């Protein structure tokens, strides 16, 4: 959650955390899905991509290399969907990985 909050990205749903059946109707409103652990949620993300055209990111944001890769994938999806705006998260990546 912190990663997305740091990037000023609003979280639509965290499944299954505190979710209900009624919340599931909001799933297609998301721009993309982040699957931080492939063991949990990957099949759902694949289903949502196939049926609703929602891209997903399955890179686990752990370790310097994978955190940077995950953020770059987020940036790619956000820039593909954002209208009249371009996002660049390289300074955030630098800030998070420089002194590790």
UniProtKB/Swiss-Prot annotation:
What's this protein's function?
A: Component of the dark-operative protochlorophyllide reductase (DPOR) that uses Mg-ATP and reduced ferredoxin to reduce ring D of protochlorophyllide (Pchlide) to form chlorophyllide a (Chlide). This reaction is light-independent. The NB-protein (ChlN-ChlB) is the catalytic component of the complex.
One GO cellular component this record assigns the protein to is: chloroplast
Keyword check for Disulfide bond, yes or no: no
**Complex and partners:** Protochlorophyllide reductase is composed of three subunits; ChlL, ChlN and ChlB. Forms a heterotetramer of two ChlB and two ChlN subunits.
Similarity comment? Belongs to the ChlB/BchB/BchZ family.
What is the protein named?
A: Light-independent protochlorophyllide reductase subunit B
Instruction: Name what cofactor the protein needs.
Output: [4Fe-4S] cluster
Q: Which Pfam family would be a valid example here?
A: Oxidored_nitro
**Which reactions does this protein catalyse?**
chlorophyllide a + oxidized 2[4Fe-4S]-[ferredoxin] + 2 ADP + 2 phosphate = protochlorophyllide a + reduced 2[4Fe-4S]-[ferredoxin] + 2 ATP + 2 H2O
Listed A to Z, the keywords are: 4Fe-4S, ATP-binding, Chlorophyll biosynthesis, Chloroplast, Iron, Iron-sulfur, Metal-binding, Nucleotide-binding, Oxidoreductase, Photosynthesis, Plastid
**Enzyme Commission number, as recorded:** 1.3.7.7
Q: Lineage in the entry? A: Eukaryota, Viridiplantae, Streptophyta, Embryophyta, Bryophyta
Query: Entry cofactor note text?
Result: Binds 1 [4Fe-4S] cluster per heterodimer. The cluster is bound at the heterodimer interface by residues from both subunits.
Q: Is Ligase there in the keyword field? A: no
Task: Write out the GO MF terms.
Answer: 4 iron, 4 sulfur cluster binding; ATP binding; metal ion binding; oxidoreductase activity
């Amino acid at each position: 959650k912190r990663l997305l909050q740091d990037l000023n990205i609003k979280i639509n749903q965290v499944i299954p955390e505190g979710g209900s059946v009624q919340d599931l109707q909001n799933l297609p409103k998301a721009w993309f899905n982040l699957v931080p652990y492939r063991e949990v949620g990957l099949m759902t993300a694949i289903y949502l991509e196939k049926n609703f055209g929602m891209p997903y990111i399955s890179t686990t944001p752990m370790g310097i290399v994978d955190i940077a890769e995950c953020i770059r994938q987020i940036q790619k999806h956000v820039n593909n969907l954002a209208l009249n705006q371009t996002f660049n998260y390289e300074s955030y990546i630098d800030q998070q990985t420089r002194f590790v």
